[in-house]
């Protein structure tokens, strides 16, 4: 069994689709933890709709993505955890694929389908919808199944280090989880992947399971985009302060280094 951690903020429509795909796509009855990082009333209708299938961790106030994710992991009942953003869509049989491809002492990343070109050359680029309103879940599920058959790979590749994250809860705790000092969580993922790599975990990617990612649904205005860009720059500066140098990204295998 898997404990799924889904932090959510102010995107109830995205959360609804995320939960629908997660619940309908699973083979086993996994623990699904929705971490409500403030704005419970905004998400209340969606949470009540899926109440039978989920555990709700209501933080009552906005504590930030990193702390919210850490608290979600602390509440995981199973050793295997899957951390997923609420703007992701789960494919069919996602739990079986992940458990089959996972090996000990690793962090396994399911590949992603995105509608825009990405800096991660492993991602599959296909516009199946850039908003919740234009997305067809059944169409995605059928496309993803066909895609898996075309690019099926027997063993994962060492090109992980992107979200979503599938790993052992104990390994997550050993490396200290997300660093809660990163503004908006920007660059915290690079920091986390760096810690995992330095701790000896293999950073793996499976192409037998693709999640859809809408990419920055909440960044809808020039002001929000500017704020996000500034937060990212602040994140890189904090990483330099913490580690003594900026975190470097290898575009070939996505490994993070100093």
Language-model features, listed with the residues they occupy:
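Active-site donor/metal-binding and catalytic loop motifs
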Residues: 115, 183, 205-224
């Amino acid at each position: 069994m898997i404990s799924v951690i889904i932090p959510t903020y102010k995107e109830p429509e995205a959360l609804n689709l995320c939960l629908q795909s997660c619940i309908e796509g699973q083979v086993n009855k996994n623990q699904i933890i929705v971490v409500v990082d403030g704005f419970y009333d905004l998400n209340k209708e969606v949470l009540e709709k899926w109440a039978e299938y989920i555990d709700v961790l209501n933080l009552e106030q906005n504590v930030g993505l990193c702390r919210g994710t850490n608290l979600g992991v602390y509440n995981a009942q199973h050793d295997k955890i899957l951390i997923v953003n609420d703007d992701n869509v789960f494919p069919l049989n996602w739990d079986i694929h992940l458990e089959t491809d996972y090996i000990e002492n690793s962090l396994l990343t399911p590949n992603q389908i995105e509608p825009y070109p990405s800096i991660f050359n492993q991602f599959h680029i296909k516009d199946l919808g850039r908003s919740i309103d234009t997305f067809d879940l059944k169409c995605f599920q059928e496309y993803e199944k066909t895609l898996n058959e075309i690019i099926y790979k027997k063993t994962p590749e060492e090109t992980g280090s992107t979200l979503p994250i599938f790993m052992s809860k104990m390994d997550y705790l050993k490396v200290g989880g997300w660093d809660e000092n990163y503004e908006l969580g920007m660059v915290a993922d690079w920091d986390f992947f760096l810690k995992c790599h330095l701790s000896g975990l293999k950073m793996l990617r499976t192409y037998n399971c693709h999640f859809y990612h809408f990419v920055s649904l909440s960044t809808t205005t020039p002001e929000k985009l500017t704020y996000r860009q500034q937060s990212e720059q602040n994140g890189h500066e904090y990483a330099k302060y913490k580690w003594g140098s900026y975190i470097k990204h290898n575009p070939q295998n996505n490994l993070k280094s100093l």
